[in-house]
Amino acid sequence: MTPRIWELVGLSTLETLYMGFIATLFAIVIGLPIGLLAFLTGKGEILENRRANQVLNVIINIGRSVPFIILLIILLPFTRLVVGTTLGTTAAIVPLSVSAIPFFARLTANALLEIPSGLTEAAKSMGATNWQIVTKYYLPESIPILINGITLTLVALIGYSAMAGAVGGGGLGNLAITYGEHRNMIYVKWIATIIIVLIVMLSQKLGDHLAERFDHR
């Protein structure tokens, strides 16, 4: 392998990490409140609202059901509107984020369902407001499961970023197609694959470690 190929491998790896981490950040910032509301408006919860809960769940389920490659195509006009182009790593972050938001929202709602059922009553008996119940009881109690959800989201996005790269999104997927396939450099495809596997394994290991650290049960 030439120094130029190694340089491209390094750059493509950084692009993949950039897409994965930024899209995960958007998923947390937007998906967490949506998932929280989906849980809080559920039956028997502090903001119980059947209509709002149904609407939120429909939005989340529709968002999760659209295959990423189709979402990528559907969002081309929106991506161009937001970043001015449909090519490159920054452009790829738009569909990656949109796909990850409902995914993480569902993981958040499911994480909150793991909270002991008597916690709300105990908090209310001590005079806690709804805001205090959420910030001092629900979220701290669900941190380990939320960390697992963040890890799962990042791992999924690393895989999606390879698909985005295959259609001009940059990263290791684009490297594998451009050099590994079109220029018949088979070893480039293998290197890109191995690096993606290593990123996923390291992300999972780090996520598991953090979840264990925050789990005080």
Curated annotation (Swiss-Prot):
Question: One biological process GO term for this chain?
Answer: D-methionine transmembrane transport
- Gene Ontology cellular component terms for the protein in this record: plasma membrane
Q: Which UniProt keywords apply?
A: Amino-acid transport, Cell inner membrane, Cell membrane, Membrane, Transmembrane, Transmembrane helix, Transport
Tell me the compartments it is located in. Answer: Cell inner membrane
Superkingdom of origin: Bacteria
Predominant localisation class: membrane
Show the coiled coil region(s): none
InterPro entries named among the record's database cross-references: AA_ABC_Transporter_Permease, MetI-like, MetI-like_sf
Q: How does it sit in the membrane?
A: Multi-pass membrane protein
Query: Which segments constitute the ABC transmembrane type-1 domain?
Result: 13-207
What does the similarity note say?
A: Belongs to the binding-protein-dependent transport system permease family. CysTW subfamily.
> What does this gene product do?
Part of the binding-protein-dependent transport system for D-methionine. Probably responsible for the translocation of the substrate across the membrane.
Protein name (database record)? Probable D-methionine transport system permease protein MetI
Q: What is the lineage of its organism?
A: Bacteria, Pseudomonadati, Pseudomonadota, Gammaproteobacteria, Pasteurellales
